[in-house]
Amino acid sequence: KYFNMTGWRLGWLVVPEALVDVIERLAQNLFICASTVSQQAALACFEADSLALYEQRRAEFKARRDYFIPALNELGLTVPVMPDGAFYAWADCSAACARLGLKDSWDFAHAALHQAHVAITPGRDFGSFETAQFVRFSTANSMDELHMAIARLKAWLKP
């Protein structure tokens, strides 16, 4: 993901010595027979200009996260774990649901879309264990869009 090449069937693993044989067999099936184009693109990832660009993007994603997560927390949409490497925020919306008379994150996501004009994903899309109280936000948007989303949520949640 760091190189923006998800789905290219390329990769490597770092594992303890005792797992090398087993993981090697698994890895062969995950990224065997990479095309020449994919291999050349992968090599280009390690050029100085490419690495500088990836570091710039990483810093931009970090800045977005560092703005957005505290802003969600201030709105009462608690993010229990600070994302480290992902561009999503997993936020607890149960207090907001109780305040707004909403049943769960499904209703919260629907209301956020139609009332605040902010698209989020209900937790149940990611499993069944305690997901009804969580929603997922993307922080991959521009900083301007994240500011707009927070402003809209704030106006909706704290009238």
Stretches found by the model and what they are:
Residues 1-159:
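PLP-dependent class I/II
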